[in-house]
């Protein structure tokens, strides 16, 4: 007997696009944040305090300031180098913000769960899901070696499951 590893009850009415590293990805994330009307759920492992990271954080702050309920979950280890000033500006913006699972040491062993999910979802209708973090080095431009990674943009009823 074969046991399927993945089972999915297909529902019509959704659309999926593939994004590659770099500007197609970061541009789509910024556009999704800028067009959100009701809420944004944003979680990632790493966001650097560089041009790319600040671009995305600024978009989240703009959304919160225009009244979009904005939730931000960052991995405590992957974002440990963010400055206190940047973290304070996120806190002060109205974004509902938390760090996931700070590492701790017990009996000489470090225990740490990491948040490697990268999900940006807006209004329960559109989500971007993938492996890319938010930093300049994830642009993967031909002139400079970078990460080559992918994400999918999902639109439609499948996003309801992400919101649940």
Pin down the residues of each PLM region.
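HKD-type phospholipase D/PLD-like phosphodiesterase module
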Residues: 4-39, 43-164
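Cofactor-/ligand-binding subdomain signature composed of acidic, glycine-rich
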Residues: 1
């Amino acid at each position: 007997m074969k046991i399927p590893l993945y089972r999915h009850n297909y529902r019509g009415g959704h659309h999926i696009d593939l994004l590659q590293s770099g500007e197609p990805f970061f541009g789509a994330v910024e556009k999704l944040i800028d067009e959100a009307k009701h809420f944004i759920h944003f979680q990632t492992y790493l966001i650097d305090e560089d041009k790319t990271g600040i671009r995305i954080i600024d978009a989240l702050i703009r959304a919160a300031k225009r009244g979009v309920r904005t939730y931000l979950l960052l991995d405590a280890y992957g974002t440990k180098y963010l400055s206190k000033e940047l973290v304070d500006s996120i806190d002060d913006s109205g974004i509902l913000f938390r760090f996931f699972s700070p590492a701790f040491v017990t009996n000489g062993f470090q225990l740490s769960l990491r948040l490697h999910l990268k999900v940006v979802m807006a209004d329960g209708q559109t989500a971007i899901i993938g492996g890319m973090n938010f930093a300049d080095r994830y642009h993967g431009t031909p002139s400079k070696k970078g990460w080559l990674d992918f994400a999918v943009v999902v639109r439609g009823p499948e996003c309801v499951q992400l919101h649940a």
